[in-house]
């Protein structure tokens, strides 16, 4: 069963209220959205977006008690301006994205997200989308490209060995399943590395492939580049990330929102008169409690960062 990560902490940070309008860009099964509306009380509205149609169908049932105040749309979260304009919304009182993979996706072998189950090489969040599945990337990409994405997005030290093993294997026949790919990656790992690793050797490579299949970092940057322009003064943006690449991007954007001067470093006295858009609510990211991690091991790497829009 999917458990929303850092639910209490997220609601405490967003401070929903009865007259507010909220965006949940990754509504998933509706857990965070339900808590936002329940905490806000009567009158609050929520727009929930998700790429996964199956997740949206469950979210619709979860959020049924708030039906008239919920607007669910099947789309990427970076498309939120189009959706908000269609709703006639001009400003938001809060926005949330939780950029992890849900249990609905991880635990369904047919989706191809996990090396723990044997399924097809898919990994697409939106199964109706035209983007390449993992099958195309694994079986058609050049070795140098595979090495680059495994190294860059998985931060995998054995990227070269893994890319070489993939190319050698597919010369005889296409790689078709997650188990086949995971076993191949494990065999490519040096025995000494396998012995000392705390995680399955395929963990970082599967992360890298998922990021590429779904253009996850590009999607995140698009969202962060636009969202602060849609937040009302006093409204907050909350982002839950699960690995260092995502968190680094979130941290950089939130830092840029709080910057009071954007003059080049060689200018001795500020002449830009730039005003910060936001203040940081979380100087350091909020992490899950030990209790939550013990109840939901998948939350262990989560980080919550929050910024609040200021009156310009």
UniProtKB/Swiss-Prot annotation:
Binding site for S-adenosyl-L-methionine: 30-32, 50, 80, 98, 105
Highest classification ranks of the organism: Bacteria, Pseudomonadati, Thermodesulfobacteriota, Desulfovibrionia, Desulfovibrionales
Protein's cellular compartments: Cytoplasm
InterPro entries assigned to the protein according to its UniProt record, in alphabetical order: RsmH (IPR002903), SAM-dep_MeTrfase_MraW_recog (IPR023397), SAM-dependent_MTases_sf (IPR029063)
Keyword annotations: Cytoplasm, Methyltransferase, rRNA processing, S-adenosyl-L-methionine, Transferase
A GO term for molecular function: rRNA (cytosine-N4-)-methyltransferase activity
Taxonomic source organism: Lawsonia intracellularis (strain PHE/MN1-00)
Protein name (Swiss-Prot/TrEMBL): Ribosomal RNA small subunit methyltransferase H
Major subcellular location class: cytoplasm
Entry coiled-coil feature ranges: none
Any one cellular-component term (Gene Ontology): cytoplasm
GO biological process: rRNA base methylation
Similarity-based family: Belongs to the methyltransferase superfamily. RsmH family.
Protein role: Specifically methylates the N4 position of cytidine in position 1402 (C1402) of 16S rRNA.
The organism's place on the tree of life at top rank: Bacteria
Keyword S-adenosyl-L-methionine: yes
Enzyme Commission number(s): 2.1.1.199
